[in-house]
Amino acid sequence: MTKITKTLFAASLLLISYVLFRLVDYSKVMLGHPLSNIYHDIHGYTPQLFFLKVCGFHQSCPYWYNGIKTFIATPPAWYFFAYPFYIITNNLFIAFYITAILIFLFSFLAIYYIGKIKLKSRLQRLAFFAFVFGNNVTMLTLRMDRLPELFAWFFLIISFFIILHYKDREIAWPFYLLAPMYALTILSYHGVGILLSFIFLGLFLVKLIENKTEAIKVALTGILGFGLTAFWSIPLLLEARNLFISQTSLGAEAWWDFAGNYLHFTPIAIIILPLGFFIIFYLYLKTNEKTNDLIFIAPSFLLIVLFMSGLIKFIPIIKTIFSNIFFIFIIILISYYLLNIKFGKLNTNFAKLASVLIIVLTIGTIAISMYNTPLYDTATPEQRNVAELLNYVDEKFIIAGGLREIKSNHHAIYAYAPIYNNLTTAGGQYPALKDFQYLEDLDALHGNFSVSCEVFSSFSDKLNVKQYIAYGKNCDWLSYCGAKLDKTIGKACLYSK
């Protein structure tokens, strides 16, 4: 067993152990809806799974924002996957955790069995899974409850290995499985689907140079894959201009966005991960004799350069992809090409250095993850007091003024209310579902009461708000503006207009 082999085994063991530790900790999600604002996207996911059951797909649903059309802007694949578990268990949070476990299990099996077409040894496949799923970014993605995104990575990885397999051989019928894989990636998390398109484009360029007939097959497969998303993507495109999703500036960050805070993980990763990819890919080319790798990687290479430079922020559609998604994409590429470097062709001292770096980076990513990514939290007594007030709500309500004092926010309560109390609200957790003007009016009610009582009352009438939940000093402001006190629990209060 060579030194690099021993190193890969040790690194894989450490990272997979860390994955298991995080999955065990994540089982706390089954205890019920978290009410904090710390690293939680579950506030947007479990209510929509509930909406799928009670309202249906692409149907009017009254619970959020004075009524929404379900899944008009939400990729639905994970919800369809989770729905049977929700029906069987009759518990959103048990179903949520089951799908988390299955995504990691299915990803491991896909890498182990499908990955062997390009990663020949078991250790290579084990290491690939460990590097892709045991790193700081993926563990943060799990901690933030982003199961639809993790579901998309599962399909991207399958697609990646299929594409790599046919890059160097004639296309046969199994290749066309890429069409549903591409569709499922988009329908799970469209940002990941966009990145898969760049790998697809690399294959198209290779085939265009080598065999134009096969290039046409690749293009038609991609078109078919996107076509399979038509039941969701066409309604989205038709409605997009009326939704906040078309006006949001959220997405990829540039290193200059962190002026004065360059020691933050994100700006460091924006520079270090692309540099790592460039170095690893160079070493891969140096130790392998394939002629089409540069052509294949060119679209992804360009994308990574744009991301590293910050120019990605100026490119339509792509600029809406969050930085963490780019990070995982780059980690997948780094992992694959690292595991295919023929270290025997490199200087012995370099191979020793590589072994040391792999161990240092493995320990480093676990340490960073433990430091930056807190363990899963449960509701505090103060947060439960706010949620308990929902038992006394009998009209359309909003959270007035915010809940930062108790490390919660209106999103958490708007997610909790329909699931546990069957309540409707003028607010919601998924702003992409409404237009910008509506959200601006809503923010006036969510804000720290920077408007007059008259303006506050006017916005309440406009959004059909009849009751307010508030906390601490915000309760005093509601009283000052003439609202009627209905109930207090601790420092939490419920007022009527």
Language-model region placement:
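Membrane-interface transmembrane helices that cradle and orient dolichyl/undecaprenyl
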Residues: 157-174
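Active-site lumenal/periplasmic loops and adjacent helix-entry segments of GT-C-fold
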Residues: 18-157, 184-185, 190-194, 373-379, ...
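Extracytoplasmic
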Residues: 109, 171, 246, 290, ...
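Membrane-interfacial loop-to-transmembrane alpha-helix junctions, especially the N-terminal start
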Residues: 8, 123-126, 171-174, 214-219, ...
